[in-house]
């Protein structure tokens, strides 16, 4: 274990699934950004129209997590997860073919329909993503494997977002590159899924309850019966709220507060994604496969520290042209801001990976996928709460740096509560 978990990338029990989830995360974001870029630059004629479609796209993608997560969890527990993954990848390939036609024709309705389908695809893959790891790996490998999965997801999001937006030509409304890219990646994902080893059913006798609201309520209630699992889900959901608030306001922070152009924003996005990935992988180097919950609140306190420093480091914007990537880093303060962004993301990676690993270990095998699915519902709910929080603070004329300040204080309170309550979990688990 001295070399971390990278040796797992040489093994069939991990590599095919690793590639499959990477390609899936890449494609979700590549298609979404290609679609939004096409709509913004070629299919709409004013900012309000473009922002309307952006809001609709966000709602359509997240909606299936509320409606179908319970069903997805049941299916993942009942059937072979490797087989389920292949079926999901076939669906993704079909969606990408339909989506490529919608991009080529510039049909917004078909694009939105495809994006909704990708939301369904992600909803059904979500429970499998973490529930399948204990089927293939011993407990000592789970922390490292989870770190690789978590870190690679954010790298895939970054690459997909970048490639998706760049695949739409500014002068050519026919998105040939986007069409080619999304279909090829879908084929790659399906191909890699064919090599995933079997992951037999852990709950064959379960009856699939198609009453969505009833089974969702039942699952949400059941996780509260296990204190450690419920607490982990709440902390993970708080992470997604943090990420939603920061990433939602990062473009405006870069433009209107720092007075920098889109190249600086692209760098910030890269720093954030790479920071989480580095933190996710570093956990296993530190703890050598041991799941350490006591370190979680300390990593959360670090997030608060760097978010607070982001507030203090933010200068008053001077009038003038937007700063480019070259001119932005002529000031030490801007280096400090970039460092803060990287480190708050790095610290986030340090605390989410042990929690995701704990969920895998603490969940009963026969209901593991349903518990992961329930976590996804809570994550989606907290992301919506984060969006509402930003809108509310802006309504009361809170400046973006002040939002970061408030966020750092709230996170410190959550970290303190986590520190107190995780002690109880550690005692209960001994």
Model-found features: residue ranges?
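Helix-loop junctions on the cytosolic side of multi-pass membrane transporters
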Residues: 131, 135, 182-208, 314-317, ...
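Juxtamembrane intracellular "pre-TM" segments in multi-pass secondary transporters
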Residues: 1-15, 199-235, 256-257, 323-329
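Substrate-agnostic recognition of the 12-TM MFS/MFS-like secondary transporter fold
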Residues: 15-33, 57-95, 110-169, 231, ...
């Amino acid at each position: 274990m001295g070399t971390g978990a990278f040796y797992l990338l040489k093994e069939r029990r991990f590599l095919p699934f690793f590639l499959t989830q990477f390609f899936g995360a890449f494609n979700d974001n590549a298609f979404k950004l290609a679609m939004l870029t096409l709509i913004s630059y070629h299919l709409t004629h004013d900012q309000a129209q473009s922002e309307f479609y952006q809001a609709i796209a966000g709602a359509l993608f997240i909606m299936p997590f509320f409606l179908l997560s319970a069903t997805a969890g049941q299916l993942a527990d009942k059937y072979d997860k490797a087989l389920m993954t292949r079926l999901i990848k076939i669906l993704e390939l079909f969606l990408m073919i339909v989506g490529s036609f919608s991009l080529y024709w510039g049909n917004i309705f078909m694009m939105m329909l495809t994006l909704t389908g990708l939301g369904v695809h992600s909803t059904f893959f979500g429970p499998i993503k973490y529930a399948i790891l204990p089927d293939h790996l011993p407990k000592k490998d789970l922390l490292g494997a989870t770190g690789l999965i978590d870190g690679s997801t954010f790298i895939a999001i970054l690459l997909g977002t970048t490639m998706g937006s760049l695949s739409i030509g500014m002068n050519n409304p026919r998105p040939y590159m986007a069409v080619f890219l999304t279909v090829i990646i879908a084929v790659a994902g399906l191909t890699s899924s064919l090599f995933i080893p079997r992951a037999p059913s852990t709950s064959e006798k379960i009856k699939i309850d198609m009453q969505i609201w009833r089974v969702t309520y039942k699952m949400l209630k059941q996780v509260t019966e296990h204190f450690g699992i419920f607490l982990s889900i709440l902390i993970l959901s708080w992470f997604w709220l943090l990420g939603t608030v920061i990433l939602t306001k990062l473009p405006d922070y870069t433009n209107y507060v720092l007075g920098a152009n889109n190249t600086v924003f692209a760098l910030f996005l890269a720093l954030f994604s790479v920071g989480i990935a580095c933190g996710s992988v570093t956990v296993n180097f530190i703890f050598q496969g041991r799941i350490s919950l006591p370190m979680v609140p300390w990593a959360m306190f670090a997030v608060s520290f760097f978010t607070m420093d982001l507030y203090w480091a933010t200068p008053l914007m001077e009038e003038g042209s937007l700063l480019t990537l070259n001119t932005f880093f002529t000031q030490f303060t801007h280096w400090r801001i970039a460092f803060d962004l990287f480190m708050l993301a790095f610290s986030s990676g340090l605390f989410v990976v042990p929690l995701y690993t704990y969920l895998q270990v603490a969940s009963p095998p026969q209901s593991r996928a349903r518990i992961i699915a329930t976590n996804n519902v809570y994550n989606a709910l907290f992301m919506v709460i984060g969006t509402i929080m930003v809108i509310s603070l802006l309504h009361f004329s809170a400046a973006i740096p002040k939002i970061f300040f408030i966020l750092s204080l709230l996170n410190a309170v959550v970290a303190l509560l986590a520190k107190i309550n995780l002690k109880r979990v550690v005692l209960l688990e001994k």
